[in-house]
Structure formats: C-alpha cells, structure tokens
C-alpha cells in the first residue's frame, strides 16, 4: 500500500480533490490518503512532517504563504520525504500574468465553494417552491413572495435565489384563501407584491399576445384586475407585519434591493 499525505493551510479539500482526480487515471491501485489540515505555523508543519515520517510516503501540499511553503519544503528534505507543492508555482504564474500579487489568504477556494453550493441549494429549493408548489415547505424559506399573477414573483424569486436566499412564492387568486401554511411563516419573511392596475393590464395583455391568445378575456380585463388587486390589498391589511413592495415600473433588481433591505434589518448578521 502506498501512502499519500495531503497537507494544507485550510481544509485540505482542494489538494485532496486534485490528487483524487489524478488517481482516477490509475486502476486497481492500493493507496491510502492522509489529510492534515489548517497547518498555519512552522510548529504545525513540523508536527505534520514528523507524523508523515513514521510511515513515509509522498506529500502533496497547498500552502498559500510562500514562506511556510519553503519551510515545509526544507523540512521535508531534512527528513528525506518527497514533498510536491501544488499551489505556489500556479500562484507565481498567475501573479506574473495578472500583474498583481495573490492575497495569500488560506481557505478562499473553500469559501467560494461553500458560497456556490449555498446558491445552488437555494436555486433548487426556489424552483421547487415556484407558483405555490409544496406549501408544506414554506416554513423552510428565507423569503416568501405573495401576489397576483404577473407581479414578477418568479423572476424575483430566482434573482434572490442566485444570491443565496431560499425563496418560495405563492399566488394570490381572487376569492381563494391562500394555503394555511402561509400564515405559519415568520411574518417578517413574507413580502406582498402590489402593482398599478393599468400597468398589470398591459403586462397581462402582452403575455396573452405572446401566447397568441385574445387579450379580451377576464385575465387582462381592467375591472377584474382591480378586483384582484383590491382582494390582495385587503389580505395585506390583515397582516400588517408583512412587507409590501410596489413593483410598478421597477426592475427586478430594484424590487429585490427593497426586499433585502427589510430582510437584513430583520435578520442582521
């Protein structure tokens, strides 16, 4: 059995992924990986190398501090251990190419990966909660958007999801009570969307034309739209702790900024 030691100043996930990716090119090999993470002082490195020397094998390491990287290299040589630096040559090449020095902050890639997976999880949740789907999961949402049809619930939901927020949206339909689960959501998380009636008629009419349908039905009828919005306003008045956003002539980005301002005030870091 061959031993491979993975040394890192952060979690060690980066060096392990690189080595595992390389190992996929070799079939039926007996290899044991030993990960040693958060090595941020000379003492940490010396202790790790002493441990590796007990059962020698090759060492792969990622240390963004080139002083510590050089120390590891020298100490490994003293112990007659083979150590391969996976990150310093890359950092030097990129620094030369970009004309700026690296930040030398351990764990940046891990932080980026964590943020990426958080966003993907939020997007997946938001897609599944679109248009009132799975109301039993409303309590899991960071933000719940409510409003009549064509008030930008879905575009807003997806925009916020890509910022890492789990968003659900619930349609408000004239004469139909929203799902009971909506009233169980923490009030500060609920955002009611409202819009000018004439603007909503224009949006719905354009939608119908794009679908090659007549805009003369009740969906884009001004009187019907007024009734829907009045029903919506009455619902919002019953729940004064809900945030209400007027999305008339606002971009998704502008509406999202208003929502997040209230959200951040209610849930400060």
Curated annotation (Swiss-Prot):
The enzyme's main class, written as a single word, is: transferase
Query: Which is one Pfam family of this protein?
Result: Kinase-PPPase
Asked if the Swiss-Prot or TrEMBL record annotates the protein with the keyword DNA damage, the reply is no
Catalytic activity as recorded in UniProt? N(tele)-phospho-L-histidyl/L-threonyl-[pyruvate, phosphate dikinase] + ADP = N(tele)-phospho-L-histidyl/O-phospho-L-threonyl-[pyruvate, phosphate dikinase] + AMP + H(+); N(tele)-phospho-L-histidyl/O-phospho-L-threonyl-[pyruvate, phosphate dikinase] + phosphate + H(+) = N(tele)-phospho-L-histidyl/L-threonyl-[pyruvate, phosphate dikinase] + diphosphate
- Tell me the first and last residues of the signal peptide: none
Which keywords are on file for this protein?
A: Kinase, Nucleotide-binding, Serine/threonine-protein kinase, Transferase
Enzyme Commission (EC) number = 2.7.11.32, 2.7.4.27
One of the record's GO molecular function terms? ADP binding
| Positions bound to ADP | 147-154
- Asked whether the keyword Transferase is assigned, the reply is yes
Role summary: Bifunctional serine/threonine kinase and phosphorylase involved in the regulation of the pyruvate, phosphate dikinase (PPDK) by catalyzing its phosphorylation/dephosphorylation.
Q: Which NCBIfam families match?
A: PRK05339.1
**Family as reported in the entry's similarity comment:** Belongs to the pyruvate, phosphate/water dikinase regulatory protein family. PDRP subfamily.
What is the protein name given in its UniProt record? Putative pyruvate, phosphate dikinase regulatory protein
């Amino acid at each position: 059995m061959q031993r491979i030691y993975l040394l890192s100043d952060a979690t060690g996930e980066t060096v392990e992924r690189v080595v595992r990716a390389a190992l996929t090119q070799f079939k039926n090999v007996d290899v044991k990986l030993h990960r040693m993470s958060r090595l941020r002082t000379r003492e940490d490195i010396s202790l790790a190398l002493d441990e590796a020397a007990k059962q020698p094998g090759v060492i792969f390491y990622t240390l963004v501090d080139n002083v510590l990287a050089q120390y590891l290299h020298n100490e490994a040589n003293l112990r007659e251990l083979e150590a391969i630096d996976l990150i310093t040559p890359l950092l030097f090449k990129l620094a030369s190419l970009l004309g700026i020095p690296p930040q030398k902050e351990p764990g940046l890639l891990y932080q980026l990966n964590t943020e990426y997976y958080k966003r993907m999880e939020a997007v997946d949740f938001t897609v599944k909660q679109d248009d009132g789907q799975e109301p039993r999961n409303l309590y899991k949402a960071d933000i719940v958007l409510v409003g009549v049809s064509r008030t930008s619930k879905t575009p807003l939901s997806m925009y916020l999801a890509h910022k890492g927020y789990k968003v659900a949206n619930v349609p408000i339909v004239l004469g139909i009570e929203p799902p009971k689960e909506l009233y169980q959501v923490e009030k500060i998380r609920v955002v009611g969307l409202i819009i000018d009636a004439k603007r909503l008629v224009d949006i719905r009419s354009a939608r119908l034309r794009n679908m090659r349908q007549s805009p003369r039905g009740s969906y884009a009828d001004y009187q019907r739209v007024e009734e829907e919005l009045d029903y919506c306003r009455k619902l919002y008045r019953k729940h004064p702790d809900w945030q209400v956003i007027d999305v008339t002539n606002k971009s998704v980005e502008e509406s999202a900024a208003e929502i997040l301002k209230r959200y951040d005030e209610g849930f400060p870091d």
